[in-house]
Amino acid sequence: MEENSSELDSNNFNVLVDNLAGLSLTDEEVRRILSPRKEGSRQLPSSTSKDEDSEEASHKYDFEIDRDSLKSDSGSPRLHQNATAPTSSTPLQSPDESVNKLNSEDEEGNSSVAPFFLDTTNFDRLNDNITTDDEQLSPVLTANQGFQSQEQYEEDSYNNYDYTSDPSSPNYISSSLDQLPHLDDEDDLQLTPIKEERNYLHSQDAPTTNALSKKISDILIPASAMKDLKDRKNALAKEFEESQPGSSLTLKEQANVIDNLRKEVFGLKLKCYFLYDQLNKFHDQEVQDIMKQNIDLKTLTMELQRAVAGYEKKISGLESRIKPDQSFNLSTPSPAPSNLITLQSRYSQALSELETTKRAFAALRKEKSKKTNYSVGAYNEDRNVLSNMLDNERREKEALLQELESLRVQLSKKVPMPAKNTDERVIETLQRSNELLRMDISMQNEALLLRKQENDRLVKQVEELTVALNSGKMNAIVEAESSKNELWDSMMVSRMKTQEQSIELTRLYKQLQDIEEDYENKLMRMEQQWREDVDQLQEYVEEITQELQDTKEVLSKSSKESDDYEEVVGKLRTEAEREIEKFEKTIRENEESISLFKEEVEKLTDEITQLSERYNDKCHEFDELQKRLQTLEEENNKAKEDSTSKTSNLLEQLKMTEAEVDSLRKENEENKQVIALKESELVKSNDNKLLLNEQIESLNDQLSQLKTEMESVTTSKESLADYLSNLKERHNDELDSLNKKLREFEGILSSNSSLKSEIEERNNQYVTLRENFDSLQNAIMETFDKQVTHCSVNHLVQQIRKLKDENKKDQSGTDKLMKKIYHCEQSLKEKTNSLETLVSEKKELKNLLDAERRSKKAIQLELENLSSQAFRRNLSGSSSPSERSQSRELKLLQASEKRLKEQVEERNSLIKNIVTRFTQLNTGSKPVNTNVEALTTISSMNQAVNMNFRELDKSIQEFKRKCQSMEREFKTELRKLDGVLEARSKRLSQLEERVKLLGAGSTSSIPNSPRASKRVSLDSEDKKLVPASPDKSAVQRGITALKRDAEGMSHIWQLRLREMEFQLKAEQEGRKRDKLGARERLQDLIRQNRSLSRQIKTDKESNSRSPSISSQEHK
């Protein structure tokens, strides 16, 4: 028993020394402690088993130390080193092992969890540097410094936590229970029992910083409190030096005292560590609660900021209203000077109140920025938890102090020892550690007191801010009441304006529908015409290709015949020369046969006469072909004259369009000015209308809605400005394009003049060619004449080459002319399209201007009436209007509200219809959002209008793109057709040339010899008379087909011109009808304005009578 008791005493002594070594810690040591705690939860099972083995070895080593060795070596410092060597090297246990041990113990014993104690192994790492200085930092203070250096994490709050179900509880609970000494019941100096605290254990994924650590880090301890703490520490040190405890105690008594002191120190360590864990560890639900509180605080701050911004915007709006109000007062009859003075005083008061609200909100912002991001409710909960913990600590502290005082009394009664042993040093270190712990507790108490004071101060500041907010609200309400009386009259004006605007919108919508229908009908007609023209052209091209193939075959045959004829003529000439030579020889030889030869010559002369007759027949055929060619040339000249007449008509039309463009420019400039004025008036009327509607409902609603309305007004103004700038840019671009087109038209006119000169030159060239052709005919006649002795073939070949070269030049010139004419036609078509668009835009702008002028006149009349009413009210003095007048005004307001609602609904329906119409036109575009909400506010109305206008612009642009693509395709197809026609014209010219050559090569062949002349003539007649008939028939067919084609094309163009004339006449009639309808609408609006003016006069008379009646009743 004695050996076991000695072993227990030695073990407790070693534990006490180890715990004392952990009291004085530096910042680096605390960080070393925290890092293995985090790393311990991630260790593998192999590492944890090694830690357990090392811990068991250290415990065995501690129990082997005897009590006698303690007595003998009490003064040597090696005892402490040997005792702490094995324990200091043991690492911390992982939380997973501790959880497994606790779960196994709970399942076996079904016992409740023991009080929360520390394991000695968790503090063995701190035994390397044992210091006795009093100024070392305590664990709590060093932990607080560690919190300040760590990163921020999510906010958490305290909540009850069941440590029995937590799987992350540390392993040092069970080990510390096993290693605690067994206390005797008879011992007088027992420590107060440690209460079972709730175990806020730290999970593996728990944060290292939290809300409480942030709050504690923000606390600043004053210098005076630190001085007091140092003074107390010095006083306690002096008392311990003077007392000299343990001089007359035995070893057993000293051991008991040491054990008691060790227990006290261990309990204080546990409490400090427990508080440290409570600061670090929270439950997940508490984290969520703190996050919600933080979000609520942020929303409150955002609402306050928005309120401040709204008040600032309201101030700026009221300041901006000063100028238009002044301009309005200048236009109206000037009121009495007393009213002006009262208005100025009210305005100055409102400005002063607004400045006070600004200052109050600025102060609120500054104070709010200094505050933390935590709500008052969460802060009070944390404060209550900390106060409860501190109360418990104070009670325990008082019990400990009483026990310490009793120990001091007992120690003072006994005789002091002559020399200080190791036990005395241990006692001194324990006493100093107790002092440090007490100082830490006092510091925490003082920090909590300071925190409470700060809470009280913050609560007071919040109350002051609420009072300031209430005062600001009251000032705003007073301002709203003052502005309500001023804006009451403008509400009627805005309502009348909205009525007129709705009427104008209906009229514009009808006009848009008519314009859309006209454009659709025109497009359908153009498409049908285009398709018919394409079909006709395709058929015509096919016929031409077939005829050209036939003519090619005929020409190939004719060319072959002409070559054969030339060869036969050459052979005949050579044979004739040879025969003449032979004949001369024979004459010389045989004079007797001369008579016979004469007979033969006569026969030859007869044959030659026959050949000349045939030649004459061929000449007649050639003349007929020339006549046909002349008829074709006359037809071509007629076509040229028609084209020139068409170009002259187009020039006249262009001049007319130029005059219309100039007038449109002037009207567009006037329209821009009027539109700008109307848009400014509409914005003002909408602002007044919305403000009045909101003020009638409730003043509190005004304060909440003014913010959003002012923002929407600014955005709407910006969007309208952008829209106007875009319109101006588009208009400028259109004007530039028109100028360019006019310049191009001037160039076209100059090109037409040059074309005319070129045509004249070509006619001259044609005359020269005709003369050359006649000369060629004469040369051919001379070659076949009897009187000519030699042939002129070379001369013929040269002339033919010249004719071919000149023909090629003429063809190139005609091609160039056709291209120029084509470009001119394209430019004319583009100009006609642009002019049509300008005419349509001109109509729309005229209608808008007429409507805006009418609305302006009505608004001016209403303003005059309202100004006269206000002037009469001011003259009547401060007397309030009668109940009848008030009831009438209320009825009028209700009726006007109903009208406004109806107008808004009509406007929304009109916008929907317009959008649907544009979507029908743009089949490929995306559908437009037609779900337009009730536009009862400026923001919603402006947003809806802007969105619809943007979508309309997009749809219009897409429609324009489609039209442009259609025009491009149409132009490409026309170019292709023009190319085909040009090729056809070239082929026709070539055919004409070949037909001309056919006349020269259609003569019959000459026989080979004079003796066989009859046979050759008969054979030639049989062979060549047969194919002559199909050649003539083919040529005649080609000429008749050409005539028919020319007549068909001229007929198509005539039909087109007639249709264009009909369209122009229909457009003129439509314009006349539009003018008549506009005049009728103007007359209707004038009648309505007159009726409204009469009603206003009657209302004025009734209002003027009602105050007189009320004054009589008062009298």
Swiss-Prot record:
Bias type Low complexity, positions: 165-176
Region (Disordered): 25-180, 1001-1037, 1067-1115
GO biological process, one term: dynein-driven meiotic oscillatory nuclear movement
Biased composition (Polar residues): 72-102, 119-130, 139-151, 1001-1011, 1086-1095, 1104-1115
Coiled coil: 445-915, 1072-1102
Biased composition (Basic and acidic residues): 28-41, 56-71, 1016-1025, 1067-1084
Required for interaction with mto2, as annotated region: 523-537
Gene null: resulting phenotype: Abolishes cytoplasmic microtubule (MT) nucleation from SPB and non-SPB sites. Leads to MTs escaping from the nucleus to form fewer and thicker cytoplasmic MT bundles that curve around the cell tip. Curved cell shape. Leads to unclustering of centromeres at the nuclear periphery; normally, the centromeres cluster at the SPB during interphase.
Primary residence: cytoplasm
Cystine crosslinks: none
Phosphoserine, modified sites: 94, 1005, 1009
Molecular function via GO: calmodulin binding
Leader peptide range in chain numbering: none
Compartment(s) where it occurs, according to its Swiss-Prot or TrEMBL record: Cytoplasm, Cytoskeleton, Microtubule organizing center, Spindle pole body; Cytoplasm, Cytoskeleton, Microtubule organizing center
Pfam family, one: Mto2_bdg
InterPro entries: Cnn_1N, Mto1-like_Mto2p-bd
Entry keywords, A to Z: Coiled coil, Cytoplasm, Cytoskeleton, Microtubule, Phosphoprotein
GO cellular component, as recorded: equatorial microtubule organizing center; half bridge of mitotic spindle pole body; interphase microtubule organizing center; microtubule; microtubule cytoskeleton; microtubule organizing center; mitotic actomyosin contractile ring, proximal layer; mitotic spindle pole body
Claim: Coiled coil is one of the keywords in the record: yes
Cited function: Spindle pole body (SPB) component that acts as the gamma-tubulin complex-binding protein of the SPB outer plaque. Promotes nucleation of all cytoplasmic microtubules by recruiting the gamma-tubulin complex to the spindle pole body (SPB), to the interphase microtubule organizing center (iMTOC), and to the equatorial MTOC (eMTOC) during anaphase.
Record's subunit section: Interacts with mto2; the interaction is direct and required for efficient binding to the gamma-tubulin complex. Interacts with gamma tubulin complex subunits alp4, alp6 and gtb1. Interacts with mcp6.
Protein name: Gamma tubulin complex adapter mto1
Organism of origin: Schizosaccharomyces pombe (strain 972 / ATCC 24843)
Gene transcribed to yield this protein: mto1
